[in-house]
Amino acid sequence: MAAAMPLALLVLLLLGPGGWCLAEPPRDSLREELVITPLPSGDVAATFQFRTRWDSELQREGVSHYRLFPKALGQLISKYSLRELHLSFTQGFWRTRYWGPPFLQAPSGAELWVWFQDTVTDVDKSWKELSNVLSGIFCASLNFIDSTNTVTPTASFKPLGLANDTDHYFLRYAVLPREVVCTENLTPWKKLLPCSSKAGLSVLLKADRLFHTSYHSQAVHIRPVCRNARCTSISWELRQTLSVVFDAFITGQGKKDWSLFRMFSRTLTEPCPLASESRVYVDITTYNQDNETLEVHPPPTTTYQDVILGTRKTYAIYDLLDTAMINNSRNLNIQLKWKRPPENEAPPVPFLHAQRYVSGYGLQKGELSTLLYNTHPYRAFPVLLLDTVPWYLRLYVHTLTITSKGKENKPSYIHYQPAQDRLQPHLLEMLIQLPANSVTKVSIQFERALLKWTEYTPDPNHGFYVSPSVLSALVPSMVAAKPVDWEESPLFNSLFPVSDGSNYFVRLYTEPLLVNLPTPDFSMPYNVICLTCTVVAVCYGSFYNLLTRTFHIEEPRTGGLAKRLANLIRRARGVPPL
């Protein structure tokens, strides 16, 4: 009996934590998917989504062991009492007018909005510390987020996960439109993935190909979700999304055909061993069985049909966990070829899109204008508009005008928070009803302020960026969607769940603006210094030379033998001597 005890302890020691995992199922899971969509303009959009779900209450349980969920983000949730966190880095602009509505759009630059728990006493302090920590994690300039570019929206940004209340005091939102996205931001983003970039869909994340695109956006979304149908407990969901748009005419030598290797310079070799689901969706909505206009190779595992963003879509599904899909060739290169060139038809116009511009002349006054387009033939719907304007553009609120079809359009809800010089920006939120088949113009005049010479950014003649407008709306759908199980549906269809199948939620962003401010001639001090130093050096040098130089009078020397002979000859000729 005594000899059996050490043997039992040795067995438990050898099993370690893995032995206990045999009795208890894993509390976390990973799903990954790639959606490839040929756009109406001829470009190709690729959207990656990696969802890590952890059945744990991080703020109540003393978590010390992390398996799939990144430890760096898990500690942020616990330390700063986060309810939700949404961070995105975007290079380029999503052209909604030509590409259609995206699954998840983000503004140019960096965007961060966070919901804190109601137990946080000093939200501003936690917000500042959190932005500094995220700046270090993602190698970004998020440390430039301060009170001058932070606002607290009251209606535009609702929690995407579970929320008992919506006290907007615990919400913070900021945008850095000047932020430049590069590989330094992509590398830490990939390291958060359970398989990094070694296996699964993440092997396609090759930096030189991802940044050689018309549009690049990567994001991190953290939110609490229900663990079961009754929602008796919560789980934490981490979504890492990456969207890129390839120019098919450049990558395909003038053709609309595409393949994984042509776009990413890599192919899929093996699934991620930690993923419970790994799929590739290819949009084949334009496929016609009678005409057979396109061909997808290799044959897909199955097909999927659903109403996505108000349009019925058909997708070819490639299941990477299917052993017959990759093991046969150890190389999965999905290709789409057009058997005959597609007809050059005008791309369908989305029901909602917008654009923004600045007008005026001179460097004193100007006007901000936003055009909201509702192209639905017979349905009107409301749009929530959010504008964040820097403090150095002083808005004239009495000049705010909203017109639709030549008539005044009064907003049903308006919230305005004036700016304070060097402390906080302007915040303007409005709920506007867009008539059917109309263009609504929202304009407001402003005056440029004079900055201190220390407040100008590097290269001030380039201009100062103004954050884009944010549009949130429930757009009517042309096709009624059936209620689906959000846990079983694809990831690209479950970020904004809407119970009403006749509408779908979209959040769009306009272009960031570039405004010129009265800028002093920063080269003038340099010119003055150079001129002053030159004049002083020349004048002082001359006077100093005269005051310190010693002058000596030299007596003329008598000439030598040659000179005396020359003088004798000159005298003989009657010429004055030398």
From Swiss-Prot:
GO terms for biological process, alphabetical: attachment of GPI anchor to protein; GPI anchor biosynthetic process; GPI anchored protein biosynthesis; neuron apoptotic process; neuron differentiation
Outcome of substituting residue 183 to P: In MCAHS3; decreased function in GPI-anchor attachment to protein; flow cytometric analysis of patient granulocytes and monocytes show decreased amounts of GPI-anchored proteins CD16B and CD59 compared to controls
Disulphide linkage map: 195-272, 226-231
GO molecular function, one term: GPI anchor binding
Residues of the signal peptide: 1-21
Gene Ontology annotations for the cellular component aspect, listed alphabetically: cytoplasmic vesicle; endoplasmic reticulum membrane; GPI-anchor transamidase complex; membrane
Transmembrane regions listed in the UniProt entry: 526-548
Residues bearing carbohydrate: 164, 291, 327
Compartments in which it is found: Endoplasmic reticulum membrane
Cytoplasmic compartment spans: 549-578
Mutation effect (residue 184 to K): In MCAHS3; decreased function in GPI-anchor attachment to protein; reduced amounts of GPI-anchored proteins in homozygous patient cells
Documented effect of changing residue 491 to H: In MCAHS3; uncertain significance
Family: Belongs to the PIGT family.
Stated name of the protein: GPI-anchor transamidase component PIGT
Source organism: Homo sapiens (Human)
Name of the gene this protein is made from: PIGT
